[in-house]
């Protein structure tokens, strides 16, 4: 195994620390009105399209093989697999993630490339060798 499997805290788990920051950013984004343009808006820079993001999608890579993690999901009666996830919760060296599916609506895929599924899983971050952050986006999570 890649790391000490008895590690139950995120003290020595750098991936958990990174994912905790992502979860906090995602939670914080839900508390703001994205259309605000005053001094108290929660972001810097211009907002020409007035798009407010609430998700930083991630992918995980196996520690031993370096291959991309995938997880099965069912959406609208069709089953598939995805390698793109939204981290929802981190506890110790484990993360609970939601599987994100490719957006089938080609007219909005440039602004919202993923849609949420109702498939969740918990991953032991000691088994993950690397994670990759994808461009921030908006996911209509309930």
Stretch-by-stretch model annotation:
Residues 1-91, 98-142:
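Short glycine-rich, low-complexity segments
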């Amino acid at each position: 195994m890649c790391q000490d499997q008895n590690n139950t805290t995120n003290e020595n788990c750098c991936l958990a620390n990174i994912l905790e920051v992502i979860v906090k950013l995602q939670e914080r984004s839900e508390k703001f009105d994205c259309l605000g343009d005053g001094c108290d808006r929660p972001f810097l820079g211009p907002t020409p399209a007035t798009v407010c993001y609430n998700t930083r999608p991630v992918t995980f890579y196996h520690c031993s093989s370096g291959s991309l993690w995938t997880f099965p999901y069912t959406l609208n009666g069709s089953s598939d697999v995805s390698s793109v996830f939204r981290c929802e919760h981190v506890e110790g060296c484990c993360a609970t993630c939601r599987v994100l599916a490719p957006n089938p609506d080609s007219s909005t895929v440039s602004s919202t490339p993923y849609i949420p599924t109702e498939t969740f899983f918990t991953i032991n971050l000691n088994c993950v060798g690397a994670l990759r952050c994808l461009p921030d986006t908006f996911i209509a999570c309930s």
